[in-house]
């Protein structure tokens, strides 16, 4: 759940940054309405129960509602939609509007079966893409924490040049307090 919170909190901070861009023709105070966060989880039996609790605390999931069979037909996925103003920090503290959290439109897709990452990407593009019709899509793995302005800069690359078909951000290892994580050769590399 810490990895999920790190990623989600980073995304929510990025949405707040977009809303602070008050001189922008695209973003500004109502910029959150132009962003939809889609979480696709691979397998109802596989998802970490603590991560599911964090998602429930943010208002995106209700425990006990999901069934694996409805009307004698197997269920493929469970979809929850909600607009929240709550974030859970990587240190598991709940923050809301009083800390600058903007509303965030969320879709949580909990797939019934574990069918791996590529299938999750297909779910996003094939199931949600035609409905949302996004101009830009940013895919993040759980544990990746975008910097506070990262999503804006990725979006800007597409906005400036309509010929751009893909972009990749810089990945930086978290060094930890006083750089202690650098003692781990995998992090230091």
Swiss-Prot record:
A single MF term (Gene Ontology): chitin synthase activity
The EC number(s) this enzyme carries: 2.4.1.16
Subcellular locations according to the entry: Cell membrane
Domain of life per record: Eukaryota
Gene Ontology annotations for the cellular component aspect, listed alphabetically: cell septum; plasma membrane
Top-rank EC class of the record's enzyme: transferase
InterPro entries: Chitin_synth (IPR004835), Chitin_synth_fun (IPR004834)
Keywords for the protein's UniProt record, in alphabetical order: Cell membrane, Cell wall biogenesis/degradation, Glycosyltransferase, Membrane, Transferase, Transmembrane
GO-annotated biological processes: cell wall organization; chitin biosynthetic process
Membrane topology summary: Multi-pass membrane protein
Reaction catalysis annotation: [(1->4)-N-acetyl-beta-D-glucosaminyl](n) + UDP-N-acetyl-alpha-D-glucosamine = [(1->4)-N-acetyl-beta-D-glucosaminyl](n+1) + UDP + H(+)
Function noted in UniProt: Polymerizes chitin, a structural polymer of the cell wall and septum, by transferring the sugar moiety of UDP-GlcNAc to the non-reducing end of the growing chitin polymer.
Protein family according to the UniProt entry: Belongs to the chitin synthase family.
Protein name: Chitin synthase 1
Organism expressing this protein natively: Schizophyllum commune
Lineage: Eukaryota, Fungi, Dikarya, Basidiomycota, Agaricomycotina
């Amino acid at each position: 759940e810490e990895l999920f919170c790190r990623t989600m909190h980073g995304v929510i901070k990025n949405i707040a940054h977009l809303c602070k861009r008050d001189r922008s023709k695209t973003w500004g105070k109502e910029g959150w309405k132009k962003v939809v966060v889609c979480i696709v989880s691979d397998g109802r039996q596989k998802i970490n129960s603590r991560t599911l609790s964090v998602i429930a605390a943010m208002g995106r999931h209700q425990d006990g509602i999901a069934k694996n069979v409805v009307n004698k037909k197997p269920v493929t996925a469970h979809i929850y939609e909600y607009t929240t103003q709550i974030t859970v920090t990587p240190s598991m503290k709940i923050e809301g509007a009083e800390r600058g959290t903007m509303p965030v439109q969320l879709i949580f897709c909990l797939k019934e079966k574990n069918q791996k990452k590529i299938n999750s990407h297909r779910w996003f593009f094939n199931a949600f893409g035609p409905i949302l019709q996004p101009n830009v899509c940013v895919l993040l793995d759980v544990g990746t924490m975008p910097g506070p302005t990262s999503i804006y800069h990725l979006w800007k690359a597409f906005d400036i040049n309509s010929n751009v078909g893909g972009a990749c951000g810089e990945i930086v290892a978290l060094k930890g307090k006083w750089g202690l994580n650098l003692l781990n050769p995998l992090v230091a590399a």
